[in-house]
Amino acid sequence: MMNVSQDVSVGRALLTVLLATCLTSCSGDPGLYPDDVLRLELGLGDRDQVHRVVISGGDRESADPMETVIALGSYVEFVTADWLVHEIIFELDSLSIAARNFLERTDQVASPPLISQDSRYVVYFANGPPGRYPFVLEGNGAPGRGVVVVEAGP
């Protein structure tokens, strides 16, 4: 049988574990926080989620990861890993009419040529409809492909 001081100690330990679990789960994935450049240039903060897709070339253009699943209102940052020229172009013919209209209205259909290592192209899915957003990668090698999947929030 436990005495009162043991009950209090167990209660405090459980409360500490519960608070630690809640704080770490509520803070989000630290890998999705914007870096200093995005904070400065776009004014992003800890509540903004930025998913990074690394673009590289060679015989074939490639995106890593090839599929990126995001919540509505998130950002996707395409970053070049090499000094080759790359361009990201969303496939308008493969999009729903609403998704196509969203990308055209927000002028996010295609990136400018990304010509140096660590060049970035950021797409903001603030009011875009949920769904699949396939894209083509063009550059020095054979074209590559990828997709951004936007999921509706809770």
Predicted regions and their residues:
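N-terminal secretory signal peptides that target proteins for export/translocation
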Residues: 1-10
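Sec-dependent signal peptide recognition
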Residues: 10-16
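C-terminal motif of bacterial Sec signal peptides marking the signal peptidase cleavage site
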Residues: 21-25
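Extracellular/periplasmic metallocenter environments
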Residues: 27-42, 109-154
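N-terminal edge beta-strand
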Residues: 43-76
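N-terminal post-signal-peptidase region of extra-cytosolic proteins
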Residues: 58-66, 107-108, 118-121
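Beta-strand cores of secreted/periplasmic/IMS beta-sandwich domains, seen most often
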Residues: 66-89, 122-127
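Short, compositionally biased
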Residues: 89-106
